[in-house]
Regions:
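N-proximal low-complexity "stem/linker" segments adjacent to membrane-targeting elements
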Residues: 1-32, 38-39
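Acceptor/aglycone-binding surface of glycosyltransferases and processive sugar-polymer synthases
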Residues: 75-91, 96, 108-188, 214-233
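Short beta-strand-to-loop acidic/aromatic patch adjacent to the donor-nucleotide binding site
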Residues: 95-103
Length: 243
């Protein structure tokens, strides 16, 4: 029988790069989320050397919302999403860590869905899948979907997991487990690397839940491209076979 998990603080890591148009909006969405069981929110924003007004937008938001627990870290040079996550993971003090993009593609209201398997005592890690469940999904790029499913299937073959969405942003981790991993990938290779390494932890309990997805186009600011897909392919082999 599963034992209920006690959680005091959820660390929310937000890597940002040139998200001046949306960063204040995602922070407002997070602010409105009421977590169960009096869990506190620790928001960690890592600016990856933005060249727009992202930093000033963050600072302005913090001044008018000083009751929120927000920590900000700055990279002097652009290193990539993975590097920003490494910085955020090192700063996190909560028992659990969730990853949140600043682009409004993922809805913070669904933290409750991801948290439930943990709070019920069943899970150490929870992935939010865009390909399961009955929630809303914006209809976009066919080949992105094909590529995502291919990478997920290939990753599953090596990890012996049955994930439906390895590349999802929404990943919730036991902080001690995540911090124990020697993560190296500084860009979008973070997803296959962390999946490969977390799957190797003895007796780790990984769950998946369905989430909504409000994808954006490249004109709207989407950053991932075909080169990142090839890097993900390399990382699946590197961290599962070459090690």
């Amino acid at each position: 029988m599963a034992t209920k998990q006690k959680m005091n603080t959820l660390s929310i890591i937000i890597p940002v790069y040139n998200e001046g148009n949306t960063v204040h909006l995602i922070l407002e969405k997070i602010k409105k989320v009421v977590l169960p069981e009096n869990i506190e929110k620790e928001i960690i924003i890592v600016d990856d050397a933005s060249t727009d007004d992202t930093v000033s937008c963050i600072q302005a938001y913090c001044k008018t919302n000083d009751t929120l627990k927000i920590r900000i870290a700055y990279h002097k040079k652009n290193k990539g999403k993975g590097a920003a996550l490494h910085t955020g993971i090192a700063l996190a003090t909560g028992e659990y860590i969730i990853i949140q993009d600043a682009d409004l593609e993922y809805d913070p209201k669904e933290y409750l869905i991801l948290l439930q398997p943990v709070l019920d005592g069943f899970a150490d890690v929870v992935y939010g899948s865009r390909f399961m469940g009955g929630n809303a999904h914006r209809v976009l790029f066919f080949w992105h979907t094909v590529g995502n499913k291919f990478l997920t299937t290939l990753s599953n073959m090596f990890t012996n997991l049955n994930l439906t969405d390895m590349e999802t942003c929404y990943k919730l981790f036991d902080a001690k487990m995540l911090k124990s991993l020697n993560l190296k990938e500084e860009r979008f290779g973070f997803e296959p690397e962390v999946t490969a390494k977390i799957s190797k932890i003895p007796k780790v309990r990984i769950y998946e839940v369905g989430i909504s997805y409000y994808g954006r186009t490249y004109q709207e600011g989407k950053k991932i491209n075909w080169k990142d897909g090839f890097r993900a392919l390399f990382c699946i082999v590197r961290y599962n076979v070459l090690r």
